[in-house]
Regions:
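Classical eukaryotic N-terminal signal peptides for Sec-dependent ER targeting/secretion
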Residues: 1-11
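N-terminal signal peptide
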Residues: 11-26
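A post-motif C-terminal structural segment
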Residues: 20, 28-42, 54-59, 69-75, ...
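Structural beta-sheet core signal
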Residues: 63-64, 170, 384
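Alpha-helix C-terminal capping segments
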Residues: 125-127, 159-165, 216, 374
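His/Cys-centered metal/cofactor-coordination and adjacent catalytic loops
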Residues: 136-151
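Glycine-rich phosphate/pyrophosphate-binding loops
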Residues: 153, 158, 163-183, 508-511
């Protein structure tokens, strides 16, 4: 196995109180000199020139999926992270910015220029592009047609990893039955079939997503996210929400209890938790299986998660869930596969509330940093990507350090548009932020607090929910075979590289994998 090494370059600069250290280089926040920029470029160049490919087998694979994490989202979140630390922001770095291998993913699906999270999950987890709105089935399946899914089911990187004897897990801030995590284990003609509330009247007898997880995948050792409502009976009471009559199960099954019974029958030391205190009490060293359902529906936005007035029961952060998952899964000598989704980036964008989306993206970066810190690049492949883009853009010519959530400005002077009214740096092409005043004028936001969490960025086209974007999205990777993610890839290739690197699925015998694994 090739070993990565770096030369060490020490650069000393005279810096101000607000300087930022990144990759050994101090950024002073718009006071950099020509010499500074030359030295910064040399340091970055030498680091990349001295890097070496890691071509061994990936014992472990962690996929971090930022739902809706478009390139503008990455850029704006990077700036926000820097500004939250008291710096100008542009020179900051998200945890995965430092990964040595980057590429682009083409996200269109089989029948749509702009994909959704269901068909995209099928691509990057199952290795096959499929029709919009479907999960874990090939393109023969028509959206919503239960009968057409029979015989068209696909397997995923989770299946391939389990077949190789690895431990597997999933972590998300959405419902664990939502499109991204469901791509690991479910096969449905309609992503909306999360519980039998939706499938009870569908001809063909297709099983809902929650039931597929509990019935067909008892060996998924870590499951964390939200979505208790689809696992509980309709007559049960949720500990936070109360009545479950609307979304609860009509088949009389208590899937949480069934999960417990199944783990008990397999002689596993298991835990089911639904709040932060119970989560914090878990000792990963003696835990075999963990089911954590921390919300009735999706988990809270990161900006609201720590607000006791908003979230009384408490929820772990995405980074904390990532840490616990790795601690549990890493005990398997054959390795593990873990999917971690920052799912509410997408929801913030759909609502037209950029602040919520960006704060969730910063929290997602923290989770990636946790995974990077806890693992070794010599045996663990980490790949970070998004499933699709959004329509948010970074516009105008704001000065360096201008509040990324604020109005475009130079100093105290707001930048005026053609209608002589100010505008924010972040805008959406469509969404709920569209509005006109009497006389069909764009609203004047001069005295509006655009940094408030409830503020809707202005949009050009009226939509109840902002749409996805068809842009390519970034891929950031480190570890064994991470160099295979360079260039422009079809989204379905992402799954194949993970399988190739870890010697599972169709690639279990490539390049004498058996011999390489035997020598570990």
């Amino acid at each position: 196995m090739a070993v990565r090494w770096f030369s060490v370059l020490v650069l000393v600069f005279s810096i101000g109180a607000q300087a930022l250290l990144y990759d050994g280089v101090h950024f002073s926040g718009n006071g950099e000199t020509p010499t500074f920029w030359r030295n910064q470029a040399k340091a970055s160049l030498l680091k990349r020139a001295n890097s070496r490919r890691i071509e061994g087998v990936a014992k472990n694979v962690i996929m971090f999926l930022g739902d809706g994490m478009s390139i503008p989202t990455v850029t704006a979140s990077r700036i926000l992270k820097g500004q939250l630390a008291g710096n100008t922001g542009e020179e900051a770095a998200l945890s995965f910015d430092k990964f040595p291998n980057t590429g682009l993913s083409k996200t269109y699906c089989q029948d749509s220029q702009v994909t959704d999270s269901a068909s995209s999950a099928t691509a990057y987890l199952c290795g096959v592009k499929a029709n919009i709105g479907t999960i874990g089935v090939d393109a023969r399946v028509r959206h919503g047609d239960c009968a057409s899914q029979k015989g068209a089911e696909l397997t995923s990187i989770l299946d391939w990893s389990m077949a190789a004897g690895k431990s597997v897990g999933l972590v998300t801030t959405t419902r664990v039955t939502h499109a991204t995590p469901a791509g690991l284990y479910a096969s449905v003609a309609d992503r909306g079939w999360e519980g039998d509330y939706y499938t009870k009247n569908i001809a063909g007898g297709c099983k809902d997503i929650a039931a597929q997880l509990i019935d067909d995948y008892p060996n998924v050792q870590v499951i964390m996210g939200g979505g208790r409502r689809y696992f509980m009976r309709a007559d049960q009471t949720d500990p936070e929400h109360g009545s479950n009559a609307h979304y609860g199960r009509r088949d009389g099954r208590d899937l949480i209890q069934e999960w417990k019974n199944g783990q008990h029958n397999m002689n596993r030391n298991y835990h089911y938790v639904w709040n932060a205190s119970a989560f914090n009490s878990i000792n990963a060293a003696n835990t075999d299986s963990l089911l954590g359902l921390f919300e009735y529906s999706h988990m809270q936005y990161e900006f609201e998660r720590t607000d006791p007035n908003h979230e009384k029961a408490g929820e772990p952060s995405l980074a904390e869930m990532t840490q616990k998952a790795i601690e549990i899964l890493k005990k398997n000598p054959k390795g593990y596969f873990l999917l971690v989704e920052g799912g509410r980036i997408d929801h913030g964008h759909h609502e037209g509330r950029a602040k919520l989306a960006l704060h969730d993206c910063v929290a997602f970066s923290d989770a990636v940093g946790m995974g990077d810190q806890m693992t070794n690049e010599s045996d663990t492949l980490i790949v970070v990507t998004a499933d699709h883009a959004h329509t948010m853009s970074i516009a105008g010519y704001p000065q360096r350090g201008n509040d990324i959530l604020g109005k475009s400005a130079h100093g105290s002077t707001l930048t005026a548009a053609g209608d002589h009214r100010p505008y924010t740096t972040l805008l959406y092409a469509d969404g709920p932020g569209w509005a006109v005043t009497t006389g069909n004028h764009r609203p004047d936001i001069t005295n509006v607090d655009t940094t408030d969490k409830h503020y809707l960025q202005q949009a050009a086209v009226p939509m109840a929910s902002e749409t996805h974007g068809g842009d390519d999205v970034g891929i950031f990777a480190r570890g064994p075979m991470a160099h295979l993610y360079t260039g422009v890839l079809e989204e379905n290739e992402i799954a194949h590289v993970m399988a190739y690197a870890s010697c599972v699925g169709d690639y279990s015998n490539h390049n004498d994998c058996a011999a390489a694994l035997a020598g570990k």
